[in-house]
């Protein structure tokens, strides 16, 4: 891990590493530091946002399944607020190299596979910073929101905040099978994608 006072000119990029497992943070931060990255660590999404407030990183690598604010929520917030930051999502709960549905990231790293793949991904996504891609990122990311209970008729619902007019409205949850839900703002009719936060996500 980068030590205070080390020469900044040798750093390839400043990276924020987010995971709730201390062993993962230690192993990956050492790997990334040895390969020229300046690394800061956070143990969940809330701590990651605090680190971003201190200094915006060049890259983010985040676990998905974490207590507090999950990686699903964190990456959705990052994609909307800081769409120019390249992001790699990682998890042991999904296999293969395809992004899991609803994950706002540029690449996916499966935990436990060759860490050299992660280094290759970091090299690749640093070339994605174009204004056209930034616009596409911001438009495609779903909002991750918790359920708010049940209406008088017993139907589960969520409170959705429109990113265009910033007004809030209730939305009854239908029986769709996919992870991403679609609706239009009741006020300005802006199309909105959202996904549901489950409080009992496995660590």
Go through the PLM ranges and name each one:
Residues 19, 63:
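Active-site residues of response regulator receiver
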Residues 22-40:
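Two-component/phosphorelay signaling modules centered on CheY-like receiver
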Residues 43-47, 70-73:
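Acidic catalytic/metal-coordinating carboxylates
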Residues 55-61:
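Active-site beta3 strand of CheY-like receiver
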Residues 66:
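Receiver (REC) domain active-site loop signature in two-component systems and cognate sites
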Residues 73, 92-120, 130, 134:
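Alpha4 helix (beta4-alpha4-beta5 surface) of REC/receiver domains from two-component response regulators
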Residues 88-90:
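Hydrophobic/aromatic residues positioned on beta-strands within the core alpha/beta folds
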Residues 139-203:
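C-terminal output/effector regions of signal-responsive regulators
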């Amino acid at each position: 891990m980068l030590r205070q006072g080390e020469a900044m000119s040798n750093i390839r990029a400043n990276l924020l590493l987010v995971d709730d497992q201390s062993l993962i943070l230690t192993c990956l931060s050492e790997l990334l530091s040895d390969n020229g990255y300046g690394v800061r660590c956070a143990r969940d999404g809330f701590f990651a946002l605090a680190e971003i407030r201190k200094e915006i990183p060049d890259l983010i690598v985040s676990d998905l399944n974490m207590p507090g604010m999950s990686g699903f929520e964190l990456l959705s917030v990052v994609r909307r607020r800081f769409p120019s930051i390249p992001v790699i999502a990682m998890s042991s709960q999904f296999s293969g190299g395809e992004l899991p549905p609803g994950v706002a990231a540029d690449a996916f790293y499966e935990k436990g596979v060759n860490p050299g793949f992660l280094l290759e991904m970091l090299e690749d996504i640093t070339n994605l910073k174009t204004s056209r891609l930034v616009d596409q990122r911001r438009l495609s990311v779903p909002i991750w929101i918790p359920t708010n209970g049940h209406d008088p008729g017993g139907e589960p619902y969520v409170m959705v905040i429109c990113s265009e007019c910033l007004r809030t409205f209730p939305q009854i949850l239908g029986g769709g099978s996919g992870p991403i839900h679609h609706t239009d703002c009741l006020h300005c009719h802006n199309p909105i994608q959202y996904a549901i936060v489950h409080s009992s996500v496995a660590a």
